Every structure is written in C-alpha cells, then in structure tokens.
C-alpha cells in the first residue's frame, strides 16, 4: 500500500470537507445577521432587534446550529492535523485521518437527516421568536465553541490512539503525538467549563457556580477522563509504560465526548442547557454513540498487545503517584457518571422520575478530592528539584481552585427580604440600600432596574443594579442579578417580584473566594499551555 499517496489524497479530501463546512456555517451565520426568517432555525432562535453579538451566539443557541458548529470544529481539527503532517509517510497519519473521517461522516449524516439547520418556510415568519433569554449573555458567545473545540481536540487524540491500534503498536512516539493534540483540547474544554460556570453564576441568580446539572456533568465527564489521560501519557511518551491506561483513557474520553452530546441534544434529560425539544433524535444519537463506542472498544480488544515488561514502583515514586492520580480520577468519574445517568435510566425504564442532586455529588466526591490534594502535595515534595514549572503552575491552580471552594462555602451569607426605595439592610457587615427603581427599554426587552447602594462602615463603595427584564417576543420575564467584586469579596443582588406598593423581593449574598475558583482554572490552563510549548521546543 502506498501510504504517501494515500496521505496526499486524504489531505485533499479533509481540507475540501473543511472548506465546504465553513461555507455552510458562514451561510447560516449570514442568515442570522440579516434576520432571514424564511429559515425555520433562524425564526426560532433570533429576533430582528438582537445585537450582532447575540445574533452570532444564536447561531449555536439551538440544537441544529450547535451540532453544525461541532462538526465544523472537528473538521477544523482534522484539517489542521492533515496540514501539519502532510509530508509524513508513517501509516499512523492517514489512518488517524481515516478514523476522523468516519466519525465526521457519521455526524454529518445525523445533521443532514435529523438536524438540518437550513429548512425553510414560505411565507417567511414576520418576526423571530428571539434567542432564549437565559442564553443572552456574553459568556454564551464563547462557551459552546470552546466546549466543542475541546471535544474536537480530544477526539483527534483518541483517533491517534485508535489509528495506532490499527497500525499495530502504541509506542512512545504515538503517545507524544496523542499528548500533543490532547493538551490543547483539554485546555479549550477547561476554558469552556470555566466560562459556563461563570455564566451560571452571573445569570441564574442563585449565587452558586456549579449546580451538578446533567449537562454540566456532561462536560465534566470527558474533562475528568482527559485529565487522567494527560497524566498517563506523560509516562507513556517518556518511558513507554501505562500504555493500556493511555489507550483506554483515550477511548473513554472519546465515548464521554459523544455521551455529552447524547445527554444535551436528545431531550432525555431536562436542563437549562438542553436544547432538544423532543426525543425524536434520541434513537439516532444513541445509535451513533453506541456504534462508535463499541467499535472503539472492539478494536482495543482485538489489537491491543501486552503492555510489555512489568513495571515495579518503589515507595512514593513519580509512577506510583501518577497511578494513584489515575485511580482517583477514575473513582470521581464513576461517581459523576452514575449520578448523571441513573435518573435517566430510571425514567426510561418507566419507574418514575428521580433526581440526584448536589448533596450526593458533594458527599461522594469530597474524600477523593481531598486525596487528590494530598497526592499533589506529595508529588511536589517527592519531585524536589526535578519538579517542572508547568506542573507546578497547574497544580498551584488546583490548590487555588480548592481554596476558592472552601472559602466561598464557609464565607457565604445570604438574606431574602422585601424592600422599598429608601430602606436598607445590613449583611456580613455591609449595608445594602435600595435607592430607586429605573425603567428602561433596550432592544428586545424592557426592564425595571433597581439601584442598590453598597456601604462598608458608612462609606459608599459602589452600586448594584439588579433587573427584572421582560422579553416581548417570548412573553418571558427574567431576573438579571447584579454583582460587584474585588479580588476577595463578591456582593450579589437579585430583584424578584413586586410584593406591594413600591416593594420588591430581594435576595442578597456576600461571599469570598469565588473568583479564586476561576483563577485556579486559568492557572491550570496556563500550566498546560506552558507544558505544550516546552514539549514542542524539546521535539524541535
């Protein structure tokens, strides 16, 4: 078989596919920007008075557009991989592109048959139904693309692992390639999860940053397996050990990325994030997930070879600590997976409705989270002078993240009450004074905005401006929280319903350390990118 010729032909096909998908996505985006309500998808998710930024976010604000975006970004990863290795003669590279092409073909088939975003109506709708008000937030412009960008990078890494099985060997060189593509995918997925958490904190009005919602968990699951994969690959690429760990984690990450789509888009789970309106798509989505998952596991069972010589660990070695890390991540992964899928399976079997909430997840994951922190501290001391700067930065991010969780949980104080202009209340040593109510009309909504002055020991330190918005197109009312923060504290206000003449319900929160959670996530990303940059320099 002439692998160089096959590589050239595959590259041409992959690049052409990406160009055509980019054209299709560009056409859909143009339809949103000009408010072409002859397209059903545009009429359902846009509005003529939306700003161009929100019209852009509306492109992937529904089921059909978000799937097209995912396919486009996966195709972009494939095109980047093809271009980067276009001169390579090793069969690993055309085999990787073949695996990616098969997955893209399956996803495109689903888009064409069940999720076509270009279906038209005649005569056109006079006006659009508007974008879901909960999604009209800056975080939603970047949150879904980053998640799909992360899934795409991780699917490339999994495709490298599957291609190595087809080739017959998963060695250190394959692990290095797999690691190189998993790292940016993991970074993008982490950034997407951080943005989603920030959106939930700013938009949902309950003062929390993580709700253990099924769709939040759907992105967390591949993140957990991908984090374990990066740790496993760090040993496989250097010493060619933990090869089976790396292969299986790559396959599991692929499966969980697809499972996330099944949870979000099938309508099986009810969530503020789930956009599918019926279960018609559930069967083909589940079939797609089952086909790719079973084929990947079957390939592993058929082609995976013995891992080689037995590796013996001595005491608290780096290898032993990484093995402990892998086991802990797998334990947390299993806990989250069971808590997410059990209510779904319970309902599908006709046994009724069941909800698994935050108390289960918090109690079940806490011991393993504490053990992870112990492992990180031990790894720092065991490594001594050999500790690498990227690992130090990433692990510092984990510690800052953990500190943010603890401090925000312990320091949180809240109060619910009714206030009228001129009244005030003191919470956690800070005084909130409801000064006045402003009425505004902006674009696609009207709003009642409360002006709440914030005082610290009689000194005015700022204002909070929570709103009640009414979206005319959807006939829907939304509460818009207002947040003021510094490096340590957050002051959070939500205005609720009118309870009397000039009296309104308010929920007020004061807590510390919330920003450390997202800062810790950014440090983890910085450590990963620094590791990738150093690895690239070493390879050169």
Where are these regions (language model features)?
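Solvent-exposed, non-transmembrane regions of integral membrane proteins
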Residues: 1-540
């Amino acid at each position: 078989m002439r692998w160089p010729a096959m590589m050239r032909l595959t590259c041409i096909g992959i690049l052409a596919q990406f160009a055509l998908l980019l054209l299709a996505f560009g056409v859909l985006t143009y339809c949103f920007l000009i408010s072409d309500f002859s397209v059903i998808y545009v009429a359902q998710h846009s509005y003529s008075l939306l700003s161009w930024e929100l019209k852009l976010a509306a492109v992937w604000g529904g089921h059909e557009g978000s799937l097209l975006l995912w396919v486009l970004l996966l195709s972009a990863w494939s095109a980047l991989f093809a271009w980067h290795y276009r001169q390579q003669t090793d069969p690993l590279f055309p085999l990787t592109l073949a695996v990616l092409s098969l997955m893209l073909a399956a996803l495109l088939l689903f888009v064409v048959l069940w999720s076509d975003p270009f279906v038209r109506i005649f005569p056109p709708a006079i006006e659009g139904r508007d974008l879901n008000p909960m999604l009209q937030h800056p975080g939603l412009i970047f949150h879904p693309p980053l998640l799909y960008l992360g899934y795409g990078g991780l699917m490339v890494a999994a495709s490298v692992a599957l291609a190595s099985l087809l080739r017959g060997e998963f060695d250190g060189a394959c692990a290095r390639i797999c690691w190189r593509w998993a790292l940016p995918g993991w970074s993008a997925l982490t950034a997407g999860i951080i943005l989603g958490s920030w959106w939930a904190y700013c938009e949902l009005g309950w003062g929390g940053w993580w709700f253990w919602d099924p769709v939040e968990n759907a992105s967390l699951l591949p993140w957990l397996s991908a984090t374990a994969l990066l740790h496993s690959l760090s040993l496989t690429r250097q010493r060619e050990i933990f090869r089976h760990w790396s292969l299986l984690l790559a396959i599991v990450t692929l499966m969980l990325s697809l499972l996330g789509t099944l949870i979000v888009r099938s309508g099986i789970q009810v969530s503020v994030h789930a956009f599918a309106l019926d279960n018609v798509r559930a069967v083909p989505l589940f079939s797609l997930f089952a086909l790719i998952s079973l084929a990947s596991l079957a390939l592993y069972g058929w082609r995976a070879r013995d891992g080689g010589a037995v590796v013996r660990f001595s005491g608290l070695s780096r290898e032993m600590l990484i093995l402990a890390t892998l086991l802990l991540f797998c334990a947390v992964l299993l806990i989250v997976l069971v808590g997410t899928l059990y209510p779904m399976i319970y309902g599908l079997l006709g046994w009724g409705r069941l909800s698994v909430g935050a108390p289960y997840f918090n109690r079940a994951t806490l011991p393993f989270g504490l053990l992870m922190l112990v492992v990180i501290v031990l790894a720092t001391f065991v490594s001594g002078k050999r500790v690498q700067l990227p690992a130090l930065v990433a692990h510092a991010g984990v510690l800052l993240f953990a500190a943010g969780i603890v401090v925000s949980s312990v320091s949180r104080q809240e109060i619910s009450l009714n206030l009228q202009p001129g009244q005030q209340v003191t919470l956690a040593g800070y005084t909130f004074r409801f000064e006045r109510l402003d009425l505004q009309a902006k674009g696609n909504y009207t709003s009642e905005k409360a002006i709440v002055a914030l005082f610290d020991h009689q000194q005015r330190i700022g204002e909070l401006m929570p709103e009640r918005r009414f979206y005319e197109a959807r006939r829907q009312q939304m509460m818009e929280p207002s947040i003021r923060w510094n490096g340590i504290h957050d002051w959070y206000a939500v205005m609720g319903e009118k309870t009397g003449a000039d009296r309104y319900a308010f929920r007020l929160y004061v807590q510390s350390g919330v920003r450390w959670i997202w800062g810790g996530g950014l440090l983890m990303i910085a450590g990963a990118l620094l590791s990738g940059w150093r690895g690239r320099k070493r390879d050169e």
